[in-house]
Design a protein with these regions (language model features):
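Extreme N-terminal starter segment of soluble prokaryotic enzymes
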Residues: 2-6
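Glycine-rich Rossmann-fold phosphate-binding loop(s) that bind the pyrophosphate
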Residues: 11-12
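N-terminal Rossmann-fold NAD(P) dinucleotide-binding loop
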Residues: 15-16
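Conserved S-adenosyl-L-methionine
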Residues: 24-30, 135
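Conserved N-terminal Rossmann-fold NAD(P) cofactor-binding segment
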Residues: 36-73
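Conserved NAD(P)H cofactor-binding loop of Rossmann-fold oxidoreductase domains
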Residues: 79-81
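Rossmann-like NAD(P)(H) cofactor-binding subdomain of soluble oxidoreductases
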Residues: 88-134
Length: 135
């Protein structure tokens, strides 16, 4: 049986929390963190992987690159920054799309054909833009 592999773009608060939630629920055998700050992704992955050693099931978490998307079943987009006081989620749209500008070609190049879940704010608008740009 093919093992379930989930890739998370963004190793900040939301991406890392998403990874830990997936680990606790046993939703994947392999979780990959990708972040523009590779050292951050590696650090978060090492901490979470240590925690995973206590689970009654096998789960591996590590940092990786966009080539990991080729055989992933799920991609979670968690790229973005936190809201500042007084900002709405919609105020983050321009910034979120700017951050995704370099990521979209990398996703296309990876030949990813799984499920894309976008939790980058504003999630509904960013998700629709990703759907249109990725086909």
């Amino acid at each position: 049986m093919k093992k379930r592999k989930i890739v998370i773009l963004g190793a900040g608060h939301v991406g890392t929390h998403c990874a830990s939630s997936l680990m606790f629920r046993g939703f994947a055998e392999e979780i990959i963190l990708i972040d523009q700050d590779e050292k951050k992704a590696e650090s978060q992955a090492l901490d979470l992987d240590d925690m995973g050693s206590c689970f009654p099931y096998k789960v591996t978490i590590r940092a990786g690159g966009y080539e990991e998307l080729q055989d992933a079943q799920i991609l979670v987009n968690a790229i973005g920054r936190s809201r500042r006081p007084g900002e709405t989620r919609l105020d983050l749209f321009e910034d979120s799309m700017e951050r995704l500008k370099d990521v979209i070609p990398k996703i296309k190049k990876s030949d990813f054909h799984g499920i894309l879940i976008s939790i980058t704010n504003p999630a509904d608008v960013v998700g629709e833009c990703l759907r249109r740009k990725l086909g």
